[in-house]
Amino acid sequence: HVPVVIADRMDGKTEVNPQFTPDYIYAGRTLPDQREDGVEYILDADVWQGEDGTWPAFNHAQLPLMGECNAELKFLFMPYMAQTDEVIACLKHHPEVVIVSQSNHPNRLGEHRALVHQLMTEGLQNPVVFFQHYSEDDAENLQIKSAADMGALIFDGLCDGIFLFNQGNLSHAVVDATAFGILQAGRTRTSKTEYISCPGCGRT
């Protein structure tokens, strides 16, 4: 499977660029009245009602609730430091859980990588989506920083998905396009045609 893209739409603005349509939209606590075709939605577990095309999201403090939930797909937001024996035991019984790896560590790359390696050590095969948060107002700055944060994880073959969250003044379309661009640059998912010039004659 190609890596998935999760996009933030907690502000209720659900419009997407057809060329860069995310696989999942994280809507937080409110499902929008108008949903995009072909997109599945993620809601916080305590407000999720089992609507078609929606899935619950849990945090690591909600393990008992997650174990009782009968959804076929669940998302677990979890930092590396929360990877306790209890969490590992729960994941071994719930292969349907997608882990959304979070980090506030100065070395985010190292902590994301450590989480995946710990899962491997425990023999777990749950998919891992990397959550990367920024506060950028300039598209180029977002592209550079997010590509640097994600590049090594992609080339190491550790990336099952990407979730870019930006609190700056950039449109959702820019953030979505950045996520797809990173995956295309890593040769893990193609979303647009690339034109490459011949190094000899310059023709495309």
Residue ranges of each PLM-predicted region?
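Active-site beta->alpha loop and helix N-cap motifs at the rims of alpha/beta catalytic domains
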Residues: 1-110
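Catalytic cores of alpha/beta
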Residues: 13-17, 86-90, 110-114, 137-154
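General structural feature for long, well-ordered alpha-helical segments within catalytic domains
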Residues: 18-21, 108-115, 146-149, 171-179, ...
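Short hydrophobic alpha-helical runs that function as membrane-insertion/retention elements
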Residues: 26, 129, 161-164
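Structural signal for hydrophobic packing residues in well-ordered secondary-structure cores
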Residues: 29, 70, 91, 116-123, ...
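C-terminal helical cap(s) of enzyme catalytic domains, especially alpha/beta-barrels
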Residues: 35-42, 168-188
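Glycine-rich phosphate-binding active-site loops on the catalytic face of alpha/beta enzymes
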Residues: 98, 156-171
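Small-residue-enriched alpha-helical segments and adjacent helix-cap loops
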Residues: 111-116, 120-137, 174-177, 188-204
